Amino acid sequence: MKKFLPDLIAILAFIILSFAYFFPADIEGRILFQHDTAAGVGAGQESKEYLERTGERTRWTNSIFGGMPTYQMSPSYDSTTSLKGVEKVYRLFLPDYVVLTFIMMLGFYILLRAFGISAWLAGLGGVIWAFSSYFFILIPAGHIWKFVTLAYIPPTIAGVVLAYRKKYLLGGIVTALFIALQIQSNHIQMSYYFMFVILFFVGAYFEDAYRKKELPHFFKASGVLALAAVVGVCINISNLYHTYEYSKETMRGKSELKQEGAAASQTSSGLDRDYITNWSYGIGETLTLLVPNVKGGGSGSTMSQSEAAMAKANPMYNGIYSQLPQYFGEQPWTAGPVYVGAFVMFLFVLGCFIVKGPLKWALLGATIFSILLSWGKNFMGLTDFFIDYVPMYNKFRAVSSILVIAEFTIPLLAIFALKEILSKPDMLKQEKNCRGVIAALVLTAGVALILAVAPGTFFSSFITTQEMTALKQALPAEHLAPFVANLTEMREAIIASDAWRSFFIIVIGCLFLFLYQLRKLKASFTLAGVALLCLIDMWSVNKRYLNDEQFVPKSKRSEAFVKTQADEIILQDTTPNYRVLNFIGFPGNTFNENNTAYWHKSVGGYHAAKLRRYQEMIDHHIVPEMKETYQAVATAGGQMDSVDASKFRVLNMLNTKYFIFPAGEQGQAVPVMNPYAYGNAWFVDKVQYVNNANEEIDALNDILPTETAVVDVKFKEQLKGVTEGYKDSLSTIQLTSYEPNRLVYKASTPKDGVVVFSEIYYPGWQVTIDGQPVDIARADYILRAINMPAGEHTIEMWFDPQSIHVTESIAYAALALLLIGVMLLAWTQRSKIAKKS
């Protein structure tokens, strides 16, 4: 027990720190109102109600964007239930928010202990990793999947380290377990980025094994890790496989539309190049690693909120300063900077000089790699190469987030440097190491000092192009120059204030090291001093972006989905399946909110991975039709019988039965029933085959969907090549039963015909007519269509992909392998203890 006492103390310290940061909100039960979390609740409400009602999970919901799989909404599979039990134990059953910071610290602590670093130094490492500013920006934004995935990455790498340190079985189990946990956390982008880090690590261990002539050991460890990776991946194979299949149909997949001109230079598969690089870190903005407000801070903070800036403000312009953001970097918008700690940066740079071995070069290389790729459109040569040639890279947006690699490698090398210093009291007195100290001081404290006294040295302008354009339009010509000069002075003051702060933090940290080298401080006091300094530094910066004022009573979460009078009126319609289109805040809000989806089946919605074809319909038809509809309904005073239905044929074919319009200035809403919606399904007179996606989407401008179905020739076989349908007053089809993943219709027709359903086409849907399977075709770019034989029939349509059952079997087998590994480890440890006794 005594052996593990330092570890228990470290874990207890992590718990205390986590509770302390969120005090008093954690004690009072207050919560953060997070946009992405709230959006997830809205999008998942239909699935949640179905689970509560039936005890089964639905893999499809009609709540947003007309309908889509739930693979990236609620990626829960029965095979991961036991894994979630393990996760709860690992998290020590701690409450929300508190547990996030705790697991972030614990994971890095496990990694450092795997390296053989003392519990006290590993505890410091856990703190400086976990308190990097980016993580505290993720929490209020609601990017919890990303946060948790990042928290499980250090212990995953700990397994890699253990395996290469000849603890094969333990390393393999740890690697497999945490790969499984991080993939379950469902942010593949972060896992993907850290595959590069692992490659850097493997390269370092290969070099070390080669020099020591231990290549057999290297290959043995690599084999164990490869098996562990397979097990970890297979435990999550259901999630991974269906995410992969789904991604091909989303905005991350290949568009079938042929682009012309500049658009043709975008990626042929994956996200568009501009979309991938829209959030690119500025080259000068990289200095936020050292000085947090080097680009002003976050977009959500105005100039008037900065004391340093307002001390320089011309009172004449105070009204403008209350509207201008402090941030003036290259990104369109940011919640805050990536800051890893001033003294941590000093230790990292010092580590580049005093730490020996290939792992140092791996960490330095990974850091540079991360920074260069984070520049995105500001360094397009490298970015283009990765988009075009590196598998999967073009599937992810916001390249600035690859800086998480630097946030990992910088504190890791910093701890290695501090370990060297504390274990060798005289090392900094050596001439070559003195040069390293001087270089580290120049590159950190020196840069901070220059930023403090002359910010213009690094930046040519403190005003963005967009701001300058707006100011030229808003200000009289005679005020433009003095305003720009004053704004520049204010932003220089913001930078200088934080730069002085970083400078003195580095000086104080160096003073601790200097006193230790002079034998004036013991190693324990030096470590405690550095830990306190780093904690105060990073804690205070994080409080700028996540503080107690942001927490609200739990009741606020439910208030986000309070049923409005418009909702009440619409919900009186007991028809089982129709759609609602919310015009409030159009165009920006319609496709950026899920409040509508909480109560209704929405044409709009918010999700990072919507179906690509639906997005293309939004761009080509839905948004233009919304503009026409808004104007037409407003002109008609809400009297729909005076509105030309040909202006919104696509909305009608989506069975958009209700529009929600703004009424008055107090946020009120009024529902308007659309009598022209086509209903759940209809017979058509004609099938028009087209040769490609461009012809298909363009044809919708010319046809009347109730009469003609536009079908790609690729689906001609599914409709048996028919070109003429049959439709008269005797041909009817009616939805009789609705579940999100199962629809039942009754149809009657005197002749064979073709039916189009106002449901979104997606591979995996199955249809039977009177129990006999039939093929589904895609019609009108996004809808489903089938051949209907003459007579009276029951049509059943359901979504239960066979692939789920196959992948679940694989996942259970992988779980069994992991359990066998754990049992084998326990047996070997017991045998070792028995031998010692």
Model-flagged regions — what are they?
Residues 346, 657, 704-837:
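Active-site-proximal, structured, solvent-exposed surfaces of multi-pass membrane proteins
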Residues 2-746, 752-756, 760:
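Conserved luminal/periplasmic juxtamembrane motif of membrane-embedded glycan-processing enzymes
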